[in-house]
């Protein structure tokens, strides 16, 4: 879908660039596939802030998305493409031959009226889901499981995809968007194609209020705070912090490695940081 730019009739309109959603469904979602969603304001059950920068935002309904695609060998027709406020990608309402309705992540080049199917092995066509072991090398794939039956976890946001680059001892080698290459079990499911709405990254919200509509609060820089509030705080006049970037709790940030999982280290063939090393 194309991008829309607006005439500068106000400061908020100047520079505003949004994705054109005219081809999406304009009605309400399927009631049986939605549920209410309560705002947390970034607080836990004790009322303590556990995730900063969250507050307000437009009221949303949660859409149940089928990330597992375990209804095998039953063709489904794409009824419509819809907007989903809970994610950057668009979603597709599909109707199976037995009458069941479901929402799936809409891949690029999926249109209303198309027929899709999930199974152990299917045609390599956008929207079809199958086991990674059955996909030809070079296939573009999204919504990839990391454990069989758990549901897709990799490449789910707008415009993302991974690529099958090889096979080895019952495992499939997949290159992720970050540049990482890793083994994934061949029984894990994946969906052919790249996720819809690739122009999401080229949007410009135009004004701070649009971010507030999304439920995002302003972020205060550490160097603008007092020493009691942040390790970068204080100092006479404007200072640059004087130390490597850290979180308010003193942990290194901005590029510091945080991954600690020895049990799955053996599944990573090439780290996403490999290209950065000199």
Curated annotation (Swiss-Prot):
A Pfam family per the record: Ribosomal_L2_C
Region Disordered: start-end pairs: 33-53, 219-278
GO process terms (BP): cytoplasmic translation
SMART domains per the UniProt record, alphabetical: Ribosomal_L2, Ribosomal_L2_C
Keywords assigned: Ribonucleoprotein, Ribosomal protein, RNA-binding, rRNA-binding
Bias-annotated ranges (Basic residues): 269-278
Ribonucleoprotein recorded as keyword: yes
GO cellular component: large ribosomal subunit
InterPro entries on file: NA-bd_OB-fold, Rib_uL2_dom2, Ribosomal_uL2, Ribosomal_uL2_bac/org-type, Ribosomal_uL2_C, Ribosomal_uL2_CS, Ribosomal_uL2_dom3, Ribosomal_uL2_RNA-bd_dom
GO molecular function, one term: rRNA binding
Function: One of the primary rRNA binding proteins. Required for association of the 30S and 50S subunits to form the 70S ribosome, for tRNA binding and peptide bond formation. It has been suggested to have peptidyltransferase activity; this is somewhat controversial. Makes several contacts with the 16S rRNA in the 70S ribosome.
Subunit structure, as described in the record: Part of the 50S ribosomal subunit. Forms a bridge to the 30S subunit in the 70S ribosome.
Family membership noted in the UniProt record: Belongs to the universal ribosomal protein uL2 family.
The protein, known as: Large ribosomal subunit protein uL2
């Amino acid at each position: 879908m194309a991008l829309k730019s607006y005439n500068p009739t106000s400061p908020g309109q100047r520079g505003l660039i949004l994705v054109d959603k005219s081809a999406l469904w304009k009605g309400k979602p399927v009631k049986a596939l939605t549920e209410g969603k309560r705002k947390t304001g970034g607080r836990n059950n004790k009322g303590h802030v556990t995730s900063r920068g969250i507050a307000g935002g437009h009221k949303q309904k949660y859409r149940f998305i089928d990330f597992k695609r375990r209804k095998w060998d039953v063709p489904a027709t794409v009824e419509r493409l819809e907007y989903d406020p809970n994610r950057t990608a668009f979603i597709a309402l599909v109707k199976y031959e037995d009458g069941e309705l479901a929402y799936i992540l809409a891949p690029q080049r999926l249109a209303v009226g198309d027929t899709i199917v999930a199974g152990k092995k299917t045609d390599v066509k956008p929207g079809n889901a199958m086991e990674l072991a059955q996909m030809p090398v070079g296939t573009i794939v999204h919504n990839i499981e990391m454990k069989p039956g758990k549901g897709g976890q990799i490449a789910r946001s707008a415009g993302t995809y991974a690529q099958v680059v090889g096979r080895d001892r019952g495992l499939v080698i997949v290159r992720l968007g970050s540049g990482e290459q890793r083994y994934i079990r061949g029984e894990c499911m994946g969906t052919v194609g790249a996720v819809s709405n690739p122009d999401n990254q080229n949007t410009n919200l135009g004004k701070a209020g649009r971010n507030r509509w999304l439920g995002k609060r302003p972020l205060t820089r550490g160097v603008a705070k007092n020493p009691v509030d942040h390790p970068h705080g204080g100092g006479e006049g404007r200072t640059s912090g004087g130390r490597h970037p850290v979180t308010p709790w003193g942990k290194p940030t901005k590029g510091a490695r945080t991954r600690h999982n020895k049990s799955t280290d053996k599944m990573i063939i090439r780290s996403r940081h490999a290209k950065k090393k000199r």
